[in-house]
């Protein structure tokens, strides 16, 4: 618990006090935000606001994670490093996208196809590493089961009984599944990052959930020798849950400090550098804590935002009419006359409710297992 609190404290301190330096630096080198031309008119004043603030979040989170472990003499575990791999990898994809926007002087960076391809180049190696990297007992960090609050009975490895073709099919399905989770997550968070502080605030709730989940899984882990007999049937076969909880706490703290400068009116934006990184970290945590489908609830706001875009496009293609005044959903409410800060705070409340529901479902699964 002390390591978790330290990680939060380090994260807050780093971003709260160093972000002003990066604001001045990014403004000096011309890393300013470009606004989509078809967006709400009131967003025009945001043009030129320093962007790529995600660099601050990523660096602060990683430093805070290592410092928290160092001060308490804890060893860094492969589970945390695997999350960092996805965190940094997706951040690099976002950074490339942001750099192209700055150079083109336009809000369009990487095309959708190239963005997904690069995201997959990060997600697929991550999926392979979760099996190749094992703990001291020789157990991999992931499984081929689709998970909710723990692994379900849906297991791709069941195809192994079909021979070589079955083994090949199982691996292909597993890689596609992990890729779907990762790519969907990073793009959903990126879509949500359209108003000052919206994505950062919503992700704070999601990271809080993974702090709680990791901490609980650590106390109820199958590897613990002191586990009460009545809890053995409920234990979690998760590698390094406390390490992931510490990393989630570091990200949470970094987001809290960053939000001080990112809230309306924003002094700096996280850009795709931050949005893709956060989506990648959340996806990695859901995979390694075996809570893949529960992530749909924990990150419910991101699902709604991404869903609004999909619905808008699909409905327009079929009926040549729009469901929303504009997508993503937060822009719809802006055009309905809601103030930006009103939309953000109300969406934060929704994100918090989804997180509470998700944690409740997670605990209920343990209670009634």
From Swiss-Prot:
Please state the span of the N-terminal signal peptide per the UniProt entry.
none
Query: Can you say where in the cell this protein is located?
Result: Cell membrane
- Transmembrane ranges, per UniProt, are 2-22, 54-74, 80-100, 113-133, 158-178, 195-215, 241-261, 268-288, 293-313, 347-367
Asked whether the keyword Metal-binding is assigned, the reply is: yes
Pathway, per Swiss-Prot/TrEMBL? Cell wall biogenesis; peptidoglycan biosynthesis
Record's bilayer topology term: Multi-pass membrane protein
UniProt keyword terms in alphabetical order: Cell cycle, Cell division, Cell membrane, Cell shape, Cell wall biogenesis/degradation, Magnesium, Membrane, Metal-binding, Peptidoglycan synthesis, Transferase, Transmembrane, Transmembrane helix
Q: Which reaction does it catalyse?
A: UDP-N-acetyl-alpha-D-muramoyl-L-alanyl-gamma-D-glutamyl-meso-2,6-diaminopimeloyl-D-alanyl-D-alanine + di-trans,octa-cis-undecaprenyl phosphate = di-trans,octa-cis-undecaprenyl diphospho-N-acetyl-alpha-D-muramoyl-L-alanyl-D-glutamyl-meso-2,6-diaminopimeloyl-D-alanyl-D-alanine + UMP
Query: Which cofactors?
Result: Mg(2+)
Could you tell me the EC number(s) of this protein? 2.7.8.13
Q: Which GO terms describe its cellular component?
A: plasma membrane
GO MF annotations for this entry? metal ion binding; phospho-N-acetylmuramoyl-pentapeptide-transferase activity; UDP-N-acetylmuramoyl-L-alanyl-D-glutamyl-meso-2,6-diaminopimelyl-D-alanyl-D-alanine:undecaprenyl-phosphate transferase activity
Which InterPro entries has this protein been placed in? Answer: Glycosyl_transferase_4 (IPR000715), PNAcMuramoyl-5peptid_Trfase (IPR003524), PNAcMuramoyl-5peptid_Trfase_CS (IPR018480)
Q: What family is this protein classified in?
A: Belongs to the glycosyltransferase 4 family. MraY subfamily.
Which PANTHER family does the entry link to? PHOSPHO-N-ACETYLMURAMOYL-PENTAPEPTIDE-TRANSFERASE, PHOSPHO-N-ACETYLMURAMOYL-PENTAPEPTIDE-TRANSFERASE HOMOLOG
- Give the protein's function: Catalyzes the initial step of the lipid cycle reactions in the biosynthesis of the cell wall peptidoglycan: transfers peptidoglycan precursor phospho-MurNAc-pentapeptide from UDP-MurNAc-pentapeptide onto the lipid carrier undecaprenyl phosphate, yielding undecaprenyl-pyrophosphoryl-MurNAc-pentapeptide, known as lipid I.
Q: What is this protein called?
A: Phospho-N-acetylmuramoyl-pentapeptide-transferase
